[in-house]
């Protein structure tokens, strides 16, 4: 994978999770393992184990392998693996860009920006989507034509809590249950497993950025999504929205046409096939003012 941080430093690497997923999705042996792993009883058993005290013994090795600095977090001792995985960071380590016109990142992760068109296809964990397939809602998908999809991929070493990106009024959460597909040996290929994973979204109506769709996608096995507020109501920029339990996961934002000017580096990096490393609370864009104001009207490049 090719990553670039906001200062322009490039990293080319493949972590253990990337290697495992490539094996599971792209060769016959891996797909046979995948057929077993996605069975409900296996996923349930794994989830139960990760909440036990015994699972806490896995934490020290994980911390060492992934070079995680526990001093950044509110506690350093954990009762289970999931207690560790959902650990809270110290607030000062993720300051929120406070200007009203500034849009912030909802989470830590590796970001890709894509323009949304009728023929747009987005890749998440080697699976191809249209916006309509992602939302299972044709009418809602059309609301974001011409805008941006911001896909933030979390790996196991990332902070797995996420926040609201602006002040606004949220809708009720929409839950799309997951459907696990198995392999197709005759075609020697895997059916699109990841896009059928459980996912959840809410619409955030804002004064400055239009209506932002915020979606969370669970991981392949036990990546449970926990959102704190299920119903509609007001929320604040930087307020914690929820968290993922164990598993690399994905946060997706859909932005309406003409409402947000994303930062140039995010778009340019995406055009050059780099994922941009971002942190929760940091600036990723700003309100796009209309032509009538005579401000902030620099032409935006197209993302692929």
PLM region spans:
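Contiguous, well-folded functional domains in the mature portion of proteins
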Residues: 1-304
């Amino acid at each position: 994978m090719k990553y670039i941080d906001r200062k322009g430093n490039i990293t080319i690497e493949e972590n253990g999770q990337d290697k495992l997923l490539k094996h599971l999705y792209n060769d016959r042996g891996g797909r046979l393992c995948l057929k077993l792993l996605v069975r409900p009883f296996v996923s349930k058993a794994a989830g139960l184990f990760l909440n036990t005290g015994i699972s806490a013994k896995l934490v020290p090795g994980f911390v060492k392998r992934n070079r995680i600095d526990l001093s950044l977090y509110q506690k350093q001792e954990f009762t289970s693996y999931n207690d560790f995985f959902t650990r809270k960071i110290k607030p000062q380590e993720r300051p929120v860009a406070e200007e009203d016109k500034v849009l912030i990142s909802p989470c830590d992760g590796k970001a890709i920006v894509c323009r949304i068109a009728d023929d747009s296809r987005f890749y998440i964990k080697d699976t191809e989507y249209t916006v309509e397939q992602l939302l299972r809602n044709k009418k809602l998908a059309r609301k974001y034509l011409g805008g941006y999809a911001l896909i933030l991929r979390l790996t196991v070493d990332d902070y797995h809590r996420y926040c609201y990106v602006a002040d606004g009024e949220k809708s009720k959460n929409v839950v799309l249950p997951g459907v696990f597909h198995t392999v197709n040996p005759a075609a020697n290929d895997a059916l699109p497993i990841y896009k059928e994973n459980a996912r959840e979204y809410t619409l955030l109506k804002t004064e400055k950025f239009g209506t932002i769709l915020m979606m969370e996608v669970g991981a392949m096995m036990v990546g449970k999504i926990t959102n704190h507020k299920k119903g509609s109501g007001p929320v604040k920029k930087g307020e914690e929205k929820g968290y993922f339990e164990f598993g690399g996961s994905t946060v997706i934002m859909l932005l309406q046409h003409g409402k947000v000017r994303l930062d140039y580096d995010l778009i340019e990096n995406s055009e050059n096939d780099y994922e941009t490393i971002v942190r929760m609370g940091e600036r990723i864009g700003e309100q796009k003012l209309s032509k009538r104001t005579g401000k902030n009207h620099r032409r935006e490049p197209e993302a692929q």
